[in-house]
């Protein structure tokens, strides 16, 4: 399988099977499942998304958290964090690092825009 196809295959599985939602997900699970070395997985991610494995998984988690905040207003931030495989304090820190605002501020700001 060519690198681009392999990356797309891995990315599709991580997203569609919600592998990112496993708070204990380790890169070993991915490289074993797709029968590639740890080094190859790292190279693949660097080449296609310019990220390390934790950065890649956390970016998907944050994308999903944004979607949940916008489309499921009944869910608390704690529930959203749990659904994306994080503890609420960790999600708040990651979210602020990635988007420059807290999840609550993001939700309130997006709600005002709609």
Regions found by a protein language model. Give the residues of each.
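Terminal helix-turn-helix DNA-binding modules in bacterial transcription factors
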Residues: 48-84, 109-114
């Amino acid at each position: 399988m060519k690198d681009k196809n392999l990356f797309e295959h891995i990315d599709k599985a991580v997203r569609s099977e919600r592998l990112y939602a496993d708070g204990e997900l380790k890169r070993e699970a991915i490289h074993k499942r797709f029968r590639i070395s740890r080094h190859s997985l790292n190279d693949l991610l660097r080449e296609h998304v310019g990220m390390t494995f934790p950065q890649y998984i956390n970016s998907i988690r944050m994308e999903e958290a944004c979607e949940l905040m916008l489309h499921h207003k009944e869910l608390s931030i704690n529930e959203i964090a749990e659904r994306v495989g994080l503890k609420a304090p960790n999600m708040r820190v990651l979210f602020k690092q990635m988007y420059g605002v807290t999840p609550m501020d993001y939700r309130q700001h997006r709600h005002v825009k709609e």
